[in-house]
């Protein structure tokens, strides 16, 4: 056996032991808090005074903006953050659970508790960290209160159906609880979710005074959070990331702007076996047997602002359609236009779900802590890379994912610790790549 073949054999023996997910011995790692403020558009801090977000950027890292995954919905984008996968690869393709066979469709809050919707093959960072010896927590974060391959998050809280997302007093109480998890329960990773400014942006629109006032509340909460970190003596041991799932745009409401299926010439719902419409700018359809070509030909030019595709023709750049849960026809509309189905039931002033390349869908990224450089502004990046960064901060070996560990590496101070196991996997993967070319 040649020298290269021997090295390859050794690498193949060692590598599986490094990625089995079992507990590993590591140096003391810093803790990590990931905070998401739902629907915080990338430029919401430009028309409102945000002293706490500003000071966080001065003391840490700020991205010009972050590009979310498509489709720009809450649950799919949040799951991308904790799996590092594009939505077609992690399978949480919509805010709503749906079953195309029995026609069941469940709203967002009910879907949060549907285990099989989330546990469909991808392992989120909570479970990966726990399998490598850490405790984790999820406070209201989408996907954090179900089990994955039978394993639950160490500490978790889920909001109720009628939860008031605007209560600032409760926000502070939630921060207090998370601080206790870190200090009293020795949790290493927590994901903390706030439903604003998304709810306010939907109701009043992203350019409204109400949205601006809510951003001020968000900023006050960031200040309270950072003060809490200091009070609990976590400044030197806790890395903090503040981000979001997507942005928000103003809905066009003139009669000439409406995308209304029930008014399309030659279209009839009698040709449709399953529909998922009336959810912002996104839609899915399954025509009845033998009707696919007819329905497609009617819809593809039905409205200049509507883009209808057969599943196999959906733009690959979205990384969305290649999943068994995606229907035979799917569609999205241009920025500001929402899709109405049988009747008009959407009356939001603000909406998301649009093309993730539209600037109004971009969102924020801030980070501060012992592992991050100070006063650094980085170029825009995709949210799919955040998972690799978090694994690196925790010193854990990531699951297979679509991100790249080098993209966000420049944010980190030189000498920020990687676990030995993480280093070994990177080295061995390099060996395997090189040797595969010569063996």
Swiss-Prot record:
Named cofactor requirement(s): Zn(2+)
Extracellular side: 22-422
Required for enzyme activity, as annotated region: 71-77
GO BP annotations, alphabetical order: fatty acid homeostasis; lipid digestion; negative regulation of cell population proliferation; negative regulation of DNA replication; positive regulation of ceramide biosynthetic process; positive regulation of intestinal cholesterol absorption; positive regulation of sphingomyelin catabolic process; regulation of intestinal lipid absorption
UniProt-listed InterPro entries: Alkaline_phosphatase_core_sf, Phosphodiest/P_Trfase
Binding, Zn(2+) 2: 198, 202, 352
Post-translational note: N-glycosylated; required for activity and transport to the plasma membrane.
Function statement: Choline-specific phosphodiesterase that hydrolyzes sphingomyelin (SM) releasing the ceramide and phosphocholine and therefore is involved in sphingomyelin digestion, ceramide formation, and fatty acid (FA) absorption in the gastrointestinal tract. Also has phospholipase C activity and can also cleave phosphocholine from palmitoyl lyso-phosphatidylcholine and platelet-activating factor (PAF) leading to its inactivation. Does not have nucleotide pyrophosphatase activity.
Expression across tissues: Detected in small intestine (at protein level). Highly expressed in the jejunum.
Regulation (activators, inhibitors): platelet-activating factor hydrolysis is inhibited by higher amount of sphingomyelin. The hydrolysis of platelet-activating factor and sphingomyelin can be inhibited by the presence of sphingomyelin and platelet-activating factor respectively, the inhibition of platelet-activating factor hydrolysis by sphingomyelin being stronger. PAF hydrolysis is dose-dependently increased by both taurocholate (TC) and taurodeoxycholate (TDC). Hydrolase activity against PAF is inhibited by EDTA and stimulated by 0.1-0.25 mM Zn2+.
Protein name per Swiss-Prot or TrEMBL: Ectonucleotide pyrophosphatase/phosphodiesterase family member 7
Organism lineage: Eukaryota, Metazoa, Chordata, Craniata, Vertebrata
Transmembrane regions: 423-439
Organism for this UniProt entry: Rattus norvegicus
Binding site for substrate: 95
Superkingdom assignment: Eukaryota
Signal peptide, first to last residue: 1-21
């Amino acid at each position: 056996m040649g020298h290269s073949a021997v090295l390859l054999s050794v690498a193949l023996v060692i590598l599986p032991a490094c990625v089995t997910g079992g507990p590993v011995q590591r140096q003391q790692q810093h803790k990590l808090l990931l905070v998401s403020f739902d629907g915080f558009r990338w430029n919401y801090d430009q028309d409102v005074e945000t002293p706490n977000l500003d000071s966080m950027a001065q003391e840490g890292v700020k991205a010009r903006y972050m590009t979310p995954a498509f489709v720009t919905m809450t649950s799919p984008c949040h799951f991308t953050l904790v799996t590092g996968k594009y939505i077609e690869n992690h399978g949480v393709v919509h805010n709503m659970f749906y079953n195309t066979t029995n026609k069941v469709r469940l709203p967002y809050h009910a879907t949060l508790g549907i285990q099989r919707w989330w546990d469909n093959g991808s392992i989120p960072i909570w479970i990966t960290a726990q399998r490598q010896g850490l405790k984790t927590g999820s406070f209201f974060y989408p996907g954090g209160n179900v089990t994955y391959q039978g394993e639950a998050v160490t500490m978790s809280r889920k909001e109720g159906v009628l939860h008031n997302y605007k209560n600032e007093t409760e926000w502070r109480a939630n921060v207090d609880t998370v601080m206790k998890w870190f200090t009293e329960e020795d949790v290493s990773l927590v994901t903390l979710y706030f439903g604003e400014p998304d709810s306010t942006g939907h109701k009043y629109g992203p350019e409204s005074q109400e949205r601006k006032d809510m951003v001020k509340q968000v900023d006050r909460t960031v200040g309270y959070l950072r003060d809490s970190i200091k009070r609990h003596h976590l400044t030197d041991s806790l890395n903090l990331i503040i981000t979001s799932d997507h942005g928000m745009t103003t809905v066009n409401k003139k009669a000439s702007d409406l995308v209304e299926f029930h008014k399309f010439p030659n279209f009839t719902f009698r040709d449709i076996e399953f529909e998922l419409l009336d959810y912002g700018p996104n839609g899915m359809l399954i025509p009845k047997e033998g009707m696919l070509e007819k329905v497609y030909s009617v819809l593809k030019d039905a409205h200049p602002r509507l883009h209808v595709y057969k599943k196999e023709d959906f733009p690959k750049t979205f990384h969305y359609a290649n999943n068994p849960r995606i229907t035979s026809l799917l569609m999205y509309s241009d920025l500001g236009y929402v899709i109405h189905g049988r009747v008009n039931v959407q009356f939001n002033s603000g909406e998301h779900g649009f093309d993730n390349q539209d600037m109004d869908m971009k969102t924020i990224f801030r980070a501060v802590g012992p592992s991050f450089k100070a006063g650094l502004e980085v170029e825009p990046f995709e949210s799919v890379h955040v998972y690799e960064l978090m694994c690196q901060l925790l010193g854990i070996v990531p699951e297979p994912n679509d991100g790249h560990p080098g993209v966000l590496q420049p944010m980190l101070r030189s000498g920020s610790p990687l676990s030995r196991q993480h280093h070994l996997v990177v080295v061995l993967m390099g060996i395997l790549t090189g040797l595969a070319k010569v063996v």
